[in-house]
């Protein structure tokens, strides 16, 4: 059992983007900053939703206090999240699947650059 305790500090409903924006406090005395995965799992469990709809934007730790604040976006549908969230956030939250998405995006970008170079010549 970890020495972390979580608490939802604030919830904001963003109907335009079909998501909820949460501010989650993590108290972790004498322990390291909680991982994105542990925050995602806790939020998904608390809200009773699938973990694929939860994305941690950032975790900010207060030096020497054993307390962190995490900004979390919870989407109604994971397909909407993949369109709205930046690729680097997807890569950080989805692990291997996110890294594959990032690599595919880099390949597409490089292909576009090559195409532009060929047109200029």
Swiss-Prot record:
GO cellular component, one term: ribosome
Keywords: Ribonucleoprotein, Ribosomal protein
Gene3D superfamilies according to UniProt: 3.30.70.3370
GO MF entry, a single one: structural constituent of ribosome
UniProt cross-references to InterPro entries, sorted A to Z: eRP_eS24_sf (IPR053709), Ribosomal_eS24 (IPR001976), Ribosomal_eS24_CS (IPR018098), Ribosomal_uL23/eL15/eS24_sf (IPR012678)
Superkingdom as given in the UniProt entry: Archaea
BP terms from Gene Ontology: translation
Family, similarity comment: Belongs to the eukaryotic ribosomal protein eS24 family.
Protein name in the entry: Small ribosomal subunit protein eS24
The organism of origin for this protein: Pyrobaculum aerophilum (strain ATCC 51768 / DSM 7523 / JCM 9630 / CIP 104966 / NBRC 100827 / IM2)
Gene name per UniProt: rps24e
């Amino acid at each position: 059992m970890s020495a972390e305790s979580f608490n939802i500090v604030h919830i904001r409903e963003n109907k335009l983007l079909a998501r909820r924006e949460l501010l989650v406090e993590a108290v972790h005395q004498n322990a390291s900053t909680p991982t994105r995965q542990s925050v995602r799992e806790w939020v998904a469990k608390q809200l009773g939703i699938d973990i694929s709809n939860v994305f941690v934007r950032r975790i900010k730790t207060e030096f020497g206090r054993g307390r962190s604040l995490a900004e979390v976006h919870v989407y109604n549908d994971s397909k909407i999240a993949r369109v709205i969230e930046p690729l680097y956030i997807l890569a950080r939250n989805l692990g291997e699947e996110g890294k594959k998405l990032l690599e595919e995006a880099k390949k597409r970008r490089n292909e576009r650059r090559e195409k532009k170079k060929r047109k200029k010549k």
